[in-house]
Amino acid sequence: MSYAIIEAGGQQLKVEPGRFYDINYLGVDPDSDYTIDKVLLINHEDDITVGQPYVEGATVEGTIVEHRRGRKIIVYKMRPKKKTRKKRGHRQELSRLMITSIKVNGSVIVDDSAVMTETSEEE
C-alpha cells in the first residue's frame, strides 16, 4: 500500500490514489486537475522518504470533484443571569479532491489504475 502525507488547505493529510478527501475550499473550478507539491512523506513498497520539510521533486495529482459545505457547527454564547444569549451556526466551505497519482521526479510511482487492479485481484 503506497501513500503520501501532504499539506493542503492548512491541514496535513494521509492520501492514497483512488480515494477522495474533503479539504478547505481551494477556489478551483470543479472537474479541473490540481497538483500539490507540498509532500511531506512518501511510502512506496515499505520504502519511506521523509522531506525536510518537503520531499524534493514529489507531487500529488488529483481532480476537484465538487465544492460542498461541511456539517453545521453550532456556537452558543450565554451570559448567566443577564438574559443574554447568542446562537450562531457555521458551515465550512470544502472542496472534494480525488487523488489520481503520486509522482517523484516526474515518474509515476503509483496511480489510481494500479490501485483498482490490486483490489480486483484480491477478490
Swiss-Prot record:
Give the family, as the similarity comment puts it: Belongs to the bacterial ribosomal protein bL21 family.
- Quaternary context: Part of the 50S ribosomal subunit. Contacts protein L20.
Organism equals Rippkaea orientalis (strain PCC 8801 / RF-1)
> What does the record give as the organism's lineage?
Bacteria, Bacillati, Cyanobacteriota, Cyanophyceae, Oscillatoriophycideae
What does this gene product do? This protein binds to 23S rRNA in the presence of protein L20.
Offer a single GO CC term for the protein: ribosome
The protein depicted here goes by the name Large ribosomal subunit protein bL21
GO function terms (MF aspect): rRNA binding; structural constituent of ribosome
Q: Which Pfam families match?
A: Ribosomal_L21p
Question: Can you list the disulfide-bonded cysteine pairs?
Answer: none
Q: What GO terms describe the biological role, i.e. biological process, of this protein?
A: translation
